[in-house]
Design a protein with these regions (language model features):
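Short glycine-rich anion-binding loops that position phosphate/pyrophosphate groups of nucleotides
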Residues: 50-52, 121-125
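N-terminal active-site beta-alpha-beta segment that forms phosphate/nucleotide-binding
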Residues: 1-112
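Surface-exposed, charge/polar-rich loops and edge strands
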Residues: 4, 11, 111-116, 125-128, ...
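A structured binding-face within diverse protein domains that lines the active/interaction site
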Residues: 102, 119-121
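Glycine-rich, N-terminal phosphate-binding loop of Rossmann-like dinucleotide-binding domains
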Residues: 48, 120, 182
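Short, well-ordered strand-loop elements centered on a beta-strand within folded domains, enriched
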Residues: 78-84, 128-130, 153
C-alpha cells in the first residue's frame, strides 16, 4: 500500500510548477513561523529542500536569527544520518541524491534536539510519515520515542500529501504536527 501511495503522491508533486511550490511554501512558512518563533537558543533539525519539497529558507533564517543552533542531515555509512551543524558561511556539498549537506564536523546526538522539521512525501491520518522509501529518518530518529523529553516533530508538506488512510508501521517516524499550505494538523 505504501508503494502505491508514495508513487501517486510523487506524481502529484512532480506536476507542480516552481511557482506553485514557491507560493505554497510561503503559506506554510507563515504557519511554521508561529512554532519556530517560540524556539530560542535551542537545537533545531531542518532539511535542505530538494525538487518539489517545501522551501524552508525563511524558517532557517528565523531559527538562526533567534539564536538557535541549526543542524541538517548528512548521509553516513550508506544508510544512516548524522546531524551536522549548519553555519551560514560554509559551502554546502551535494550528496548522491542531489541534496545539500554540511561539511561541518560539529555533530549533535538526536537526544540533543529540541525541534525537528521534516520533509514528507505523505502522512497518514495517525501522523506516520511517508518518505522517499529509504528509511533514513526512520532509522536515525527511532531512539527519540523513548526519550522523556522528546523534541517536537513537525512534518511539512502540501495539503494533498495528508492521506486519510492508515499505513504507518512500528518503525515509521510519527509526527506531532503536520503543517500544510491550508492547515495545521495535530496528531
Amino acid at each position: 500500500m505504501k508503494v502505491k501511495i508514495r508513487k501517486h503522491l510523487k506524481q502529484q508533486l512532480s506536476s507542480l510548477t516552481d511557482k506553485d511550490v514557491l507560493e505554497k511554501s510561503a503559506k506554510i512558512a507563515i504557519k511554521l513561523l508561529k512554532y519556530s518563533d517560540t524556539y530560542k537558543n535551542k537545537n533545531c533539525l531542518i532539511y535542505k529542500s530538494s525538487k518539489n519539497e517545501v522551501l524552508i529558507d525563511s524558517i532557517e533564517d528565523n531559527l538562526i536569527s533567534n539564536g538557535n543552533s541549526v543542524f541538517i542531515p548528512k548521509i553516513i555509512d550508506g544508510n544512516s544520518l548524522c546531524f551536522n551543524r549548519l553555519d551560514s558561511n560554509q559551502k554546502l556539498i551535494l550528496n548522491k541524491f542531489n541534496i545539500l549537506e554540511s561539511p561541518s564536523t560539529e555533530l549533535i546526538e538526536v537526544s540533543g534536539l529540541d525541534l525537528i522539521i521534516l520533509p514528507i512525501v505523505g502522512t497518514d491520518k495517525s501522523g506516520f510519515r511517508l518518505g522517499h522509501g529509504g528509511g533514513y529518518y526512520d532509522r536515525s530518529l527511532e531512539a527519540i520515542f523513548n526519550f522523556k523529553n522528546k523534541p517536537l516533530i513537525i512534518g511539512i508538506g502540501l495539503d494533498f500529501q495528508y492521506t486519510n488512510k492508515n499505513f504507518g508501521e512500528p518503525h515509521d517516524t510519527k509526527l506531532d504536527l503536520m503543517i500544510t499550505d491550508k492547515r495545521v494538523i495535530d496528531f
